[in-house]
Regions:
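Short linear motifs at protein or domain termini
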Residues: 1-8
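C-terminal all-alpha effector/ligand-binding and dimerization domain
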Residues: 9-147
Length: 147
């Protein structure tokens, strides 16, 4: 028996938070900054046909602070490419499993403790300079990853 395929007609993202915030140590190290220095923090809820499928937490290097004056519900990589020509590449990444906290469950419209696929990815530019550190919490039963 196979799972029923769902065709998504409307994919969008909703901005939850965008700010300059002090970076935790792990993130600052990847972005080649001192812990506590400012980074561009962006939190998004990703939706498919108005159903939450993922939460995206991303820390951009401070050189991308101009993002805070852009429409963050559009494609951020496209904004960066058009603005300064930066091309992005995956430096490292991995998949893991975690359980939804109460806050995550509320945003994703799942039960607290539901298993979530966690995708962590570090992105660099063509010169190897760090662009962003990302963590996405994915509702596996509502999402398909393509490789």
């Amino acid at each position: 028996m196979s799972a029923q395929e769902i065709i998504v007609e409307n994919y969008m993202q909703a901005l939850l938070k965008a700010a300059l915030l002090p970076m935790p140590q792990e993130i600052a190290e990847f972005l080649e900054e001192e812990p506590g220095s400012l980074g561009v923090y962006i939190e998004m809820l990703r939706l498919a046909d108005n159903v939450p499928v993922a939460l995206d937490y991303v820390w951009y290097h401070i050189r991308f602070s101009y993002l805070l004056s852009e429409n963050l519900e559009s494609e951020l990589y496209e904004i960066i490419r058009k603005r300064d020509g930066t091309q992005m590449n995956i430096a490292a990444g991995y998949l893991d499993i975690g359980l939804a906290t109460a806050q995550e469950a509320e945003l994703l419209k799942v039960k607290k403790g539901e298993p979530l696929l966690i995708e962590r990815v570090n992105i660099v530019d063509n010169n190897g300079k760090p662009v962003h550190y990302g963590k996405m919490l994915i509702v596996g039963r509502r999402y398909r990853l393509y490789y």
